[in-house]
Amino acid sequence: MCKPIADCKFADVVARWPGGTHDSFTFRMSEVKYYLERNHTTLDKGVIIGDSGYALKNYLMTPYDNPNDRKKRRYNTTLKACRSSVERSIGQLKRRFTCLKSGLRVQPDKACLIIVACVILHNIAKMLGEEDFEGDDDIEFECDPVDPAQDSTDGKVVRDHIANTFF
């Protein structure tokens, strides 16, 4: 699982489990999640975004399921636009390193090292201003929605505050 930032570079990469492992599981096991659980106390520290496959938390914003008013629909539209930048970052990485597109045919421990190396080299290329490879950036990943019971009450309060204040 990779966590891209606004300029299509990656702030974090976790390459410990097979490719079929859901990103939300990988996130739950990540140091970033544990850091946010301990240290995220206010909205001014920012939030991260996820799709409906993630549980809503006070630091992790997810879309509303069947939004029933204009503000919630606009929130969802904006969240989707932000998520598309995540998919664009992953698309750029996979075009730059085509070995990542079709699956690596090496031992799992070597695959993890290759993935991390590709992410590091991608970030270096972005910092040096290397051209991006052309291609389709609109990658949509399917996810199974998380059970709403896993959403935190604090997360709902923060999401509602964001929707009501900014949309």
Question: Where are the language model's segments positioned?
Answer:
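Short, well-ordered secondary-structure "scaffold" segments embedded in the functional core
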Residues: 1-167
